[in-house]
Amino acid sequence: MLLKSTTRHVRIYTAEIQKNELIPSETVLTLDVDPDNEFVWPEESLQKVYRQFDALVESNSGEDLTEYNLRRIGSDLEAFIRDLLQKGELRYNLDSRVMNFSMGLPQMDHPDSQGAYLQ
């Protein structure tokens, strides 16, 4: 049975991809990061997300594979991506088909704004 977790920027499936189709699996998780290309992803930042995903999956080993547990992993990854954005390790894709700034408005450093807003 195919289980999934879907957030704005993270999709997790209990499936393998074969010939562009999801094939349900009880032993494989497939991660799709930022399917709408809302962000510009430096390779290093994307690899950080993959490593965080691996760590979250490992920390849940031995737990039942349920939609609830997948949603927890997805929510934790979503928070991790927000943290990367706030640290400036990735940025919004201004050529994205939708500009909704789902993780907050972009912030630019400017001498006049030093200390004028909370991080």
UniProtKB/Swiss-Prot annotation:
Protein name: NAD(P)H-quinone oxidoreductase subunit M
Catalytic reaction list: a plastoquinone + NADH + (n+1) H(+)(in) = a plastoquinol + NAD(+) + n H(+)(out); a plastoquinone + NADPH + (n+1) H(+)(in) = a plastoquinol + NADP(+) + n H(+)(out)
This protein's GO CC annotations: plasma membrane-derived thylakoid membrane
Membrane-protein topology: Peripheral membrane protein
Family statement drawn from the similarity comment of this UniProt entry: Belongs to the complex I NdhM subunit family.
Top-level taxon of the source organism: Bacteria
UniProt function note: NDH-1 shuttles electrons from an unknown electron donor, via FMN and iron-sulfur (Fe-S) centers, to quinones in the respiratory and/or the photosynthetic chain. The immediate electron acceptor for the enzyme in this species is believed to be plastoquinone. Couples the redox reaction to proton translocation, and thus conserves the redox energy in a proton gradient. Cyanobacterial NDH-1 also plays a role in inorganic carbon-concentration.
Subunit structure as annotated in this protein's UniProt entry: NDH-1 can be composed of about 15 different subunits; different subcomplexes with different compositions have been identified which probably have different functions.
A GO term for molecular function: quinone binding
Organism: Picosynechococcus sp. (strain ATCC 27264 / PCC 7002 / PR-6) (Agmenellum quadruplicatum)
EC numbers for this chain: 7.1.1.-
Subcellular location: Cellular thylakoid membrane
